[in-house]
Each structure stands twice: as structure tokens, then as C-alpha cells.
Amino acid sequence: MSQGVVQEMVATALLGALDGAKKKGQLKTEAWPALTLDAPKRPEWGDLASTVAMSLAASEQRAPHDIAQIIVENLPRREQLFERVEIVRPGFLNLTVKPALWQEVLKEIESQGAAYGKADLGRGRRVLVEYVSANPTGPLHVGHGRGAAV
């Protein structure tokens, strides 16, 4: 189990909560917004944070905090996945994943050693990576953007 798998499990749980709330008639949005999970700015705020409740506020015509409460109430496998789920105004969901899940990630890292995280993504193809550096002493202009695109 990798860190990406843990994030995928959390995302699946959040989508399950949204689907469950919709089936109960608590939410009416037809299509869910893109679900993003980010690391909070402070470690005490948890492992992952989501703004999905704020993304739904306009389409639901409700306060993000109320939507976040509905999501938390409908979270599947909440006790198995989360140590703590916190709602912070205006509607942030701060999620602390159970330590046992992170311990599984650490076990995988330890067992794979230096091979952890390696992938055969490019399959031997060469890739050229360039970056654009604008003149730091002059103003930015359209040519800088053109140089980045070409």
C-alpha cells in the first residue's frame, strides 16, 4: 500500500459519502466537482484536507459548513480509515488517517528499499525537460509566454 493508495481510499470514502447523501436526498447536485486532497498547511490540522464542501456550496445553495457536516455523517468506513475528521469553517474537511494505514505504507517502503517509487513509465524513451527563465531585471511580456510554449 503506497501513500497514493491511502489518498485514493480517502477520496473513495469522500465520494461514497457524497453518493450516500444524494441517495438520502440530503444533496441534489447532479455531478460532483473534482475532488482534491491536499496536505494541510499545519500538521495539527491532519494528514489531508478537502474543500469539496465549499465547491458544492453554490450548486447546493447551502452553507459549506452544513454540506461538510452531511459529508461527515455519510462517510463510509469512517472508523476504519480515520483517526479524526474535523470540519473547520467555512467548510474545510481536515482528515487524520489512522496510523495503521500509514504503518502499512512504511512497511511497503521498507520492504521495497531503493526500488520503492520506481516506475517504468517512459519505457526507455528520452525526455527533454526545459524551463523558462524570464529576465529578472526587466518586465514580463508576451514573448516570455511564447518562449515557454515553443
Model-derived features with residue positions:
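Short, hydrophobic/aliphatic alpha-helical segments
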Residues: L27-K41, G124-P136
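Short, charge-patterned binding micro-sites
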Residues: P33-T51, E83-V88, F92-L93
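Short, well-structured alpha-helical segments that form the helix of a local strand-helix-strand
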Residues: A68-P76
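Structured, non-catalytic alpha/beta "coupling" segments that mediate domain-domain communication
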Residues: P76-S111
